[in-house]
Amino acid sequence: MKIYLIIIFFFISLFSYYSQNTKEEIISELIVDYISSKYSKEKLDNFIYIGLKRQRLYLFEANIISKIYKVSTSIKGAGNEISSYKTPLGLHCIYEKIGDNAPIGTLFINKRNTNKIVKIDSLYIHQNKDEITTRLMSLMGKELNINKGGSVDTFKRGIYIHGTSNEKTIGQPSSHGCIRMKNNDIVELFNSVDKQIPVFLFNN
């Protein structure tokens, strides 16, 4: 009887493993197909996809999802205009990576390391707290007159993927335009990607 239970457990575990893999592969294919249809000239391989309505960041390696992170985008929704405090949409790339080897909780102001460590609050929501912590990666728009140039320039707006001292808000819209992540997550992502990696932001 015991051996039968072990065999049944083995096959259930095996089924769960392949079911999960199949699910991720299906999601990967759907996202890759969607991006390819919108950006047919863009060669896809390693890239970041951010879904604003999902409040999720997907890291793709070789066109397969390798990591999924909860994020927090703008409390005001999606938009590309300067001074809108909205999260921009479209094709971007990571232009700068700042904060390598900085301790968790390091405070950054105007992309400079202040050498101060702030408290990471994972218990309470502070809507007005907008501290940039641990790591930041600035985004540059790649689409002229959509997120690059004039009054819609993402880089001039100072839009980053960054850590936050207000981790309780992760998973719900609460930022002033940037993409916030938990501090351990931003370190992992920072170490996993290179500058110029494509970043696709969609309101879905």
Question: What do these predicted regions represent?
Answer:
Residues 6-10:
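Hydrophobic helical h-region of N-terminal Sec-dependent signal peptides
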Residues 2-4, 14-204:
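N-terminal pre-domains immediately preceding structured catalytic cores
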